[in-house]
């Protein structure tokens, strides 16, 4: 069986580390962001490592668990990796909810960091 392309290996490794860290202690995610990183969380924009970590730290739950349904990774023309994640999460005693998240990863000084991060709960309005 052929080995996965390097961008898929890097993307999958990043995703695994991201959600393990998020579920255990999301304040530790500061190491993956830079001062130029951008986060869009449910339509709200945050710029820079400090603002992103503050937002993630102030999310209104004590415990959370993510379950990844699928993930896709692609190389970009400027040597970055774009990763899309679909999954479910359970926060405290709330019902299980679906979510979508997209990351743009860039190699800076031999470390993969997240320059762009977009998150949405998978909520649908039928009617």
Swiss-Prot record:
Q: Name one GO biological process term.
A: protein import into nucleus
Q: Cite the PANTHER family for this sequence.
A: NUCLEAR TRANSPORT FACTOR 2
Per its database record, what is this protein's job? Answer: Facilitates protein transport into the nucleus. Interacts with the nucleoporin p62 and with Ran. Acts at a relatively late stage of nuclear protein import, subsequent to the initial docking of nuclear import ligand at the nuclear envelope. Could be part of a multicomponent system of cytosolic factors that assemble at the pore complex during nuclear import.
What top-level branch of life does the organism fall under? Eukaryota
Q: Name one GO cellular component term.
A: cytoplasm
Q: How does it assemble?
A: Homodimer.
* Keywords associated with the record: Cytoplasm, Protein transport, Transport
**Which InterPro entries does the annotation name?**
NTF2 (IPR045875), NTF2-like_dom_sf (IPR032710), NTF2_dom (IPR002075), Nuclear_transport_factor_2_euk (IPR018222)
Q: Name one Pfam family in it.
A: NTF2
- What name has this protein been given in UniProt? Nuclear transport factor 2
UniProt keyword Transport present: yes
The residues covered by the NTF2 domain are: 10-121
Record keyword Transport present:
yes
**What are the TM regions of this chain, as residue ranges?**
none
Q: Name one GO molecular function term.
A: nuclear import signal receptor activity
Subcellular location(s): the record lists: Cytoplasm
Q: Which organism is it from?
A: Xenopus laevis
């Amino acid at each position: 069986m052929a080995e996965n392309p390097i961008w898929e290996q890097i993307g999958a490794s990043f995703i695994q580390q991201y959600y393990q860290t998020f579920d255990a202690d999301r304040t530790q995610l500061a190491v993956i962001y830079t001062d130029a990183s951008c986060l869009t969380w449910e339509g709200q924009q945050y710029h820079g490592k400090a603002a992103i970590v503050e937002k993630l730290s102030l999310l209104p739950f004590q415990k959370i668990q993510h379950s990844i349904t699928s993930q896709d990774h692609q190389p970009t023309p400027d040597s970055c990796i774009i990763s899309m994640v679909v999954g479910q999460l359970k926060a405290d005693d709330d019902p299980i909810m679906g979510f979508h998240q997209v990351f743009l990863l860039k190699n800076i000084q031999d470390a993969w960091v997240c320059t762009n991060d977009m998150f949405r709960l998978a909520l649908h309005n039928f009617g």
